[in-house]
Curated annotation (Swiss-Prot):
Lineage: Eukaryota, Metazoa, Chordata, Craniata, Vertebrata
Comp. bias regions, Basic and acidic residues: 163-176, 183-214, 221-233
Recorded coiled-coil stretches: 169-249
Superkingdom of origin: Eukaryota
Biased composition (Basic residues): 151-162
Protein name: Lysine-rich coiled-coil protein 1
Organism annotation: Homo sapiens (Human)
Region annotation Disordered: where it falls in the sequence: 141-259
Keywords for the protein's UniProt record, in alphabetical order: Coiled coil
Length: 259
């Protein structure tokens, strides 16, 4: 029997077609593939306990009725296991534990003997379920990769957004530093100017004082010279007057006194 492969536009269409085909064959496929994967591992003996009964029913549908009838010893397990369970467990938990243990014993008995060959429909169902599960896993992994890529892109965008703000803050800090430096330089310049002004004022005052002193000295010298000249003139006049009197006196003395 040849199977023609169909092409589908999307994964959802392929899944719906697969479900229709399996229902037409009398099978009920499960669409929750992650749970199916756990059930498959449990049937292969990777897990020691089974938490619910639907997996047992699904496995029961996959195996032919002859395989279940050929292992009657597995039916006597619940009574022996139930006697071994502790008395403090609740009724519901003990029932679940009993079902899980009986199912594990059943699967061990089934797979310890000669393996039962599956027919074509069962093999196709298992392969198809694993193929669909693989596609679902790829679909979810691609979604996860796109979400991580979007998150990383968002982080990069936020970092880029943060960088201009940091640049603005840095520029504002640099401006404030520059203003402070400029104000300090201006203060220093004002101080230097005031010091220079005071120095120049002092120098000007000293120069003025020195010039006045020189002027006073010159004036004093000129006065001294004038006074000396006048004194000389006076003394000269006095001398001249003294000499004239003496001659008169001499004549007077000669005439009267007879000297």
């Amino acid at each position: 029997m040849k199977h023609s492969k169909k092409t589908y536009d999307s994964f959802q269409d392929e899944l719906e077609d697969y479900i229709k085909v399996q229902k037409a064959r009398g099978l009920e496929p499960k669409t929750c593939f992650r749970k199916m994967k756990g059930d498959y591992l449990e049937t292969c003996g990777y897990k020691g306990e089974v938490n619910s009964r639907p997996t047992y029913r699904m496995f029961d549908q996959r195996l032919p009725s002859e395989t279940i009838q050929t292992y009657p010893r597995s039916c006597n397990i619940p009574q022996t296991v139930e006697n071994r369970l502790p008395q403090w467990l609740p009724a519901h938990d003990s029932r679940l534990r009993l079902d899980s243990l009986s199912y594990c014993q059943f699967t061990r008995d089934c797979f310890s003997e000669k393996p039962v060959p599956l027919n074509f429909n069962q093999q196709e169902y298992i392969c198809g379920s694993h193929g669909v599960e693989h596609r679902v896993y790829k679909h979810f992994s691609s979604d996860n990769s796109t979400s991580t890529h979007q998150a990383s892109h968002k982080q990069i965008h936020q970092k880029r957004k943060r960088h201009p703000e940091e640049g603005r803050e840095k520029s504002e800090e640099e401006r404030s530093k520059h203003k402070r430096k400029k104000s300090c330089e201006e203060i220093d310049l004002d101080k230097h100017k005031s010091i220079q002004r005071k120095k120049t004022e002092v120098e000007i005052e000293t120069v003025h004082v020195s010039t006045e002193k020189l002027k006073n000295r010159k004036e004093k010298k000129s006065r001294d010279v004038v006074s000396k000249k006048e004194e000389r003139k006076r003394t000269k006049k006095k001398k001249e007057q003294g000499q004239e009197r003496t001659e008169e006196e001499m004549l007077w003395d000669q005439s009267i006194l007879g000297f």
